[in-house]
């Protein structure tokens, strides 16, 4: 399976935004290795925003293009549909619930069958989580200190579209996320413009 292999901190500095949420990701950023302060053409800005979103969700170009085409067919605002579709990927929802400390780790957990959807094992990271779906950490992995610590450490962090049950090690997508609720720093409108040419 193809993967994005760029070093995470280096990629964050190159894009000029902490796409992985790690506190040390931007510490060594300088004007030479960061986008900050650099003038970009309109195309360059569009490309940069695409790279941010792709890198954040960890999807390759071919896969990303499928999400864009699907969003363009919708009658709703294309950028909103694009981000909503990416946000509702199983690996991302598992990360948002708190089973992992990164999307990469969440993807690995899904691949290895650690995550259940409505009680059934799903090992496809791109699986689209729907409203009402219950996402659970398999019982035998709840004793894993790393997974348990990740989950319990995020009690103070909550999103309006996810409801957590700390006793059952589960989370439910209670509604489709709105754009202003999705915690990602990117301009999806520029991405839509890029693919609309």
From Swiss-Prot:
InterPro entries: Ribosomal_uS4 (IPR022801), Ribosomal_uS4_bac-type (IPR005709), Ribosomal_uS4_N (IPR001912), S4_RNA-bd (IPR002942), S4_RNA-bd_sf (IPR036986). It comes from the Bacteria. Keywords: Ribonucleoprotein, Ribosomal protein, RNA-binding, rRNA-binding. This is Small ribosomal subunit protein uS4B. One of its GO terms (biological process) is translation. HAMAP family: Ribosomal_uS4_B. CDD domains: S4. SMART domains: Ribosomal_S4 (SM01390), S4 (SM00363). Belongs to the universal ribosomal protein uS4 family. It comes from Clostridium botulinum (strain Hall / ATCC 3502 / NCTC 13319 / Type A). One of its GO terms (molecular function) is rRNA binding.
């Amino acid at each position: 399976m193809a993967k994005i292999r760029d070093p995470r901190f280096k990629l964050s500095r190159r894009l000029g935004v902490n796409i992985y949420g790690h506190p040390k990701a931007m510490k060594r950023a300088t004007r030479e290795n960061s986008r900050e302060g650099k003038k970009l053409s309109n195309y360059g800005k569009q490309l940069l925003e695409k790279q941010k979103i792709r890198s954040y969700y960890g999807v390759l170009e071919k896969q990303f293009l499928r999400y864009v085409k699907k969003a363009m067919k919708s009658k709703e605002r294309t950028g909103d549909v694009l981000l909503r579709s990416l946000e509702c990927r199983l690996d991302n929802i598992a990360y948002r619930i708190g089973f992992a400390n990164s999307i990469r780790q969440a993807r690995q957990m899904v691949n290895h069958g650690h995550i259940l959807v409505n009680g059934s094992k799903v090992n496809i990271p791109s699986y689209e989580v729907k409203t009402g779906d219950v996402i659970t950490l398999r019982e035998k992995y709840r004793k894993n200190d790393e997974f348990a610590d990740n989950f319990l450490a995020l009690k103070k962090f909550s999103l309006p579209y996810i409801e957590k049950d700390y006793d059952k090690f589960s989370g439910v997508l209670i509604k489709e996320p709105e754009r202003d609720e999705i915690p990602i720093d990117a301009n999806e409108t520029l991405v839509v413009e890029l693919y609309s040419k």
